[in-house]
């Protein structure tokens, strides 16, 4: 049956991309690294829920910007040494300082140790002693799991970045604003290095889901976002555009123009990614690194 399909309908099917072995290796590592990120988020959320049930001082001590930092090296080291509020009350400033150094902190150790000591030794709601002790055992088990997950993530991140650095396209990809070794590895993993895979930039944009869909009937036209897309590219593109807006004046101006025109944040970000992908396709085809002046060239002012 498969042979007959190829004989009669070969024109209706696309051939698999002819990516190099190097690109396929980067794809394996980049996707494994992304799965490790999701594993860390899942275990971190489990830890946060458990800590919130009996150890509120830990939530306050390791509160970050927008989320808790219980998965940080310092938090994991200190919570392993003091898995319950009872253990935390016995910690001294000197002991906390030693734990911070053990976790890798080098600056502001004394100041941070005093801050943590004030929070962890302050009065807080407590569970009954047997329940608190049982939850402490549970906490240690989750921390051991989180240590393994964080170790795997660090190892896969280093491997993905190292594999990407040896690829010939790495120089062009990382020349774009907002693209570091990890984001570059994720982009290469999904786009590949087969130059014949995408006939033009429009094909790449449609594959990534950044190109809008226009439905027209008579005098009416509806422009909507594309739902069929490669979510891996979208995830990498989100981080790319967030960073590009901060470090590229041209990208910032493009985003601001779309926002001023009435686009939502996600729509303006998608528009920017659509434009950046088009430029990435062109630069990969030519092998020439990114040029900010050419990428976001402004039209000359009209003559008076």
Language-model-detected regions and their locations in the chain:
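A detector of single, family-specific signature residues
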Residues: 1-304
